[in-house]
Amino acid sequence: YCADLGVLIAGDMVLPRITTNVSVQAVEPDANPLRWFMDSLAVHATLPADTLVLPSHGLPFHGLRERVRYLRNHHKQRLEELVQACATPKSAADVLPLLFRRKLDERETRIAMGEALAHMHELYYDGRLRRYRDEQGVWRYTKT
């Protein structure tokens, strides 16, 4: 962020039309990237209202605070939906239809799995879900 110019080079952090891919990666299988993302959004929310945002995808835009508010609410809503869905044990694959309400191709499914895990990890580390490995070795998450 350049205060003198009122410009934020946002990269993928804040995109104008789609949500950022926040995923658990194979190199950090126990990471909590959604927490890091939400913490970063909180910082972005403090920037001036007239900030010009330069995203890595899409056109430059104004309205950073509104976009950050939307993104935070979007993820909070998804987290609440996941807690309710995990009244019975679920794997990350089980919750894909809840998080992604359209048919996903193979590539999109791989990306979506990382995002599903990021949401499950946030709830697990926040104490709202517990997890265990089932007899096939798959992590199952259930409401605490």
State the predicted function of each range:
Residues 1-79:
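Metallo-beta-lactamase
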